[in-house]
Amino acid sequence: MSFFISLEGIEGSGKTTQIKRLADRLESLGHAVLITREPGGCPIADQIRQILLHPDNGHLDPKAELLLYAAARAQHVAEVIRPALDQGKIVLCDRYCDATLAYQGYARGLDLPMVKQLNELAAGNCRPHLTLLLDMPHDRGLLRARSRNALGAGPEEGRFEQESLAFHNKVRQGYLDLARQEPQRIKVVDANGTLDEVCHRIWLTTSNALNLPGGM
């Protein structure tokens, strides 16, 4: 079954944890699943990821940041995502084009039509069939992300955690605006609650989109 699902959300919304659970559930039903992420997902894009997320690069110009994301995505799509879909796999991607719109467009203030154009250039017709937007208050998510990095889970990828609460609120509101624009594709999932509760909500939405048995 060739199907493309992206998971989006603010920092600390639990995407990385939940994407693994979703993959396990789908694989238990016999589906071939590929988990990947952005920025990154292949060697060239992973090198760009180091530039984009390292906290020492706080001075990175917003336009340079945007172009680096586009470059990483173009390689990622060509090398990983499109081949996996061609092989009939379900692709689960931790962030994709909507993240660029939310972060570089809504939060950084770059021209949204320009960002959309670059997304289209980088991704072509490789668009998610379903996007799961894990939503929670931006201050709670940021606190969770900063705590995670303080414990050493990602000390060299904390550049966005250094941004202000106002920045992260713009990211969240940007995501929600995108969901209002594309309600058929982007499904808002309440990311508050226990891991199992959020996992259940994600499965209900995913199983409905894939016409799979619901429930956990």
Curated annotation (Swiss-Prot):
Residues at which ATP binds: G9, I10, E11, G12, S13, G14, K15, T16
Enzyme class (EC, first level): transferase
EC number assigned by the record: 2.7.4.9
Entry keywords, A to Z: ATP-binding, Kinase, Nucleotide biosynthesis, Nucleotide-binding, Transferase
GO biological process per UniProt: dTDP biosynthetic process; dTTP biosynthetic process; dUDP biosynthetic process
A GO molecular function held by the record: ATP binding
TM annotation in the entry: none
GO cellular component: cytosol
Catalytic activity: dTMP + ATP = dTDP + ADP
Statement: the UniProt record of this protein carries the keyword DNA-binding: no
NCBIfam families, A to Z: DTMP_kinase
Family: Belongs to the thymidylate kinase family.
Reported function: Phosphorylation of dTMP to form dTDP in both de novo and salvage pathways of dTTP synthesis.
Protein name: Thymidylate kinase
Organism name: Syntrophotalea carbinolica (strain DSM 2380 / NBRC 103641 / GraBd1) (Pelobacter carbinolicus)
Gene: tmk
